[in-house]
């Protein structure tokens, strides 16, 4: 299986049904041309002294990279948070970013597929935004090269928010005028909206789980230690795809699901047959909060996931060669689940910064 990094010139939207597969380059260009998304000639300087109170980087993590035209500060973060929870970003005024990415669920959702504007649904589960700042590309097929650009996808996708970024900014510009000017020195437009939302999302850093405390020298349950040995070490080799500390490799893999024809995943970007059914490997951090699992939310709990992997997948023609059958005793399964649940970060999901 090839692990490909998407060229920045190749941009595709996540479409929730293969019947709507299409490029979204035209959509982005229209937003850039009509919405004034290009940065001003002079660097934008916030109208208040920069503050970074709302950016808390875990001690074991590097500081996230921020684009030159979107350096972090609290004024931009505050604007981004307000937009994140504003349901008026959707055409029917009922769906916000926070409708599909709930803080209490580690910025995922409890449904297999969360309804979008007007109750429409697609075929993708809402992925967690945990540590999204470290992702090199976005969407499950890896078709979007930046977090700022990713914002345009759900906002304009018919089965999600079903709106138009230019229209949204025109409708909300007056209300957000003061915040937008303070944050970016200009009225709300696609440039401001995409960058403010990306700023908020880059602050969603989770690295204070029980596993992190153990790695820092703290005590932990012996079951967690045994589960960690199964996970990596001389055990199952799960860490080959879910490598610590982020517990993802940001690669793409076909994990052997049987029904892939309606959503071929990475194939949409590469067109390579071997990429049919391959999706970006998700982080396992906060896995206890992010059920249901898989790109389509088909598995309701961890036992269903382990059942799938224990038999070596469903035999997809292009499934990853790392998927081979294995057998766990009841005690081993308990230990492995204890380890996975040690990746939960309760402080993260209860953080008052995210509360509306």
Can you say where each PLM-predicted feature lies in the sequence?
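Bacterial N-terminal signal peptides that target proteins for export
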Residues: 4-6, 15-26
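Enrichment for repetitive, rod-forming helical segments
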Residues: 15, 29-31, 340
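Bacterial N-terminal signal peptides
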Residues: 24-35
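Periplasmic c-type cytochrome electron-transfer domains
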Residues: 37-356
